[in-house]
Amino acid sequence: MGVKRVIVFDTTLRDGEQTPGVNFNSRDKLEIAYQLAKLGVDVIEAGFPAASNGDFEAVKNIADYVKGVTIAAMGRAVKEDIDRASSALKNAEKSRLHVFIATSDIHLQYKLKMTRDEVLKKAVEMVKYARGKFDEIEFSAEDASRTDWDFLVKVFSEVIDAGAHIINVPDTVGYAMPREYGELIRYIRNNVPNIDGVTISAHCHNDLGLAVANSLSAIENGATQVEVTVNGIGERAGNAAMEEVIMALNTRKDYFGLVHGINTKEIYNTSKLVSELTGIKLQPNKAIVGANAFRHQSGIHQHGVINNRLTYEIMRPEDIGVVPDTFALGKLSGRNAFELKVRQLGYNLSPGEISEAFRKFKDLADRKKTIVEEDIRFVVEETIEEFRGFREGEAWA
């Protein structure tokens, strides 16, 4: 039996656009879609065609021009949404409808005003209606993590019989715990009688900061598709961050034993593009793509990394397309890191000069919140002037 592969479904352009303050225009969406295809995602959820004319045109443009990847469009379980999605995806190389209806009792009572039987009937009818209009049909049970498990199994079983190829299990409000969500995925796999050959998808929100953990738990328990967004953008607290899920799978291949189609060297470029087009800056300590993700300030850590990067790095910045800027020099930095930085700047100092320059650096670092490259050059040039009687002005060869 071959190595199992996880399908990467990117919803940056649909769920990601639901981030408060984010509004992609059609050109933005197309640019991101091209980059997602270059990144190697399997499915791009391009938008919600029935939501607006602008979203319809954006989805249509992506379907018309972006090839080599499945293009998905979302719609409610109503004929008008399904028809609109079908029209938008007409020229897609491979099309997918992502149709949804809520299944939790709280949604049925307060939002849909429907009974369980009515929801089940509507779900089955709309999947049957969509059959033949798309290459694939994905059915989502909205608020699955708060739905009665046996009812969820019944819904999934009947929509599969109706023609669904993928069943999605959304933790819509980020309520589930990792073990609990994994157990739900396993329960579905073990109790839906016609599940063989059907893709089980995980879609997790980050309201409790657990979207990535829940996604990985789902994969561990049998989910074969994971739904993610670049930089974790999305409704409220966001979605599972693509870069974190993928690099967890990469870094712990020994644990998960799975492969995917992502070209990880495009992760940083993709993250940067989405950050620029959304206007959402990444926090410096953001995992994988934050400015500090591969930087070390402690002298002990810096010394370890100089000797062998594996001492304090579990992945290489080059693996995600980042040019290393390994050391953040500051008051906690040690002499080894300082000396390496001085050499990288092109200076060739004697041991005595290094000692004096390092003393000046530590004194400055105690007084200055942020040390930049020009600060290093200043203390080195000042030291050279004191020892040699002149400022070098340029790096020594």
UniProtKB/Swiss-Prot annotation:
Transmembrane segments: none annotated. The keyword Transmembrane helix does not apply. Its cofactor is Mn(2+). Mn(2+) binds at D15, H203, H205, N239. It holds the Pfam family HMGL-like. Pathway: Amino-acid biosynthesis; L-leucine biosynthesis; L-leucine from 3-methyl-2-oxobutanoate: step 1/4. Residues 6-268 form the Pyruvate carboxyltransferase domain. It catalyses: 3-methyl-2-oxobutanoate + acetyl-CoA + H2O = (2S)-2-isopropylmalate + CoA + H(+). Catalyzes the condensation of the acetyl group of acetyl-CoA with 3-methyl-2-oxobutanoate (2-ketoisovalerate) to form 3-carboxy-3-hydroxy-4-methylpentanoate (2-isopropylmalate). Homodimer. Belongs to the alpha-IPM synthase/homocitrate synthase family. LeuA type 1 subfamily. This is 2-isopropylmalate synthase 1. It comes from Caldanaerobacter subterraneus subsp. tengcongensis (strain DSM 15242 / JCM 11007 / NBRC 100824 / MB4). The lineage of its organism: Bacteria, Bacillati, Bacillota, Clostridia, Thermoanaerobacterales. The gene is leuA1.
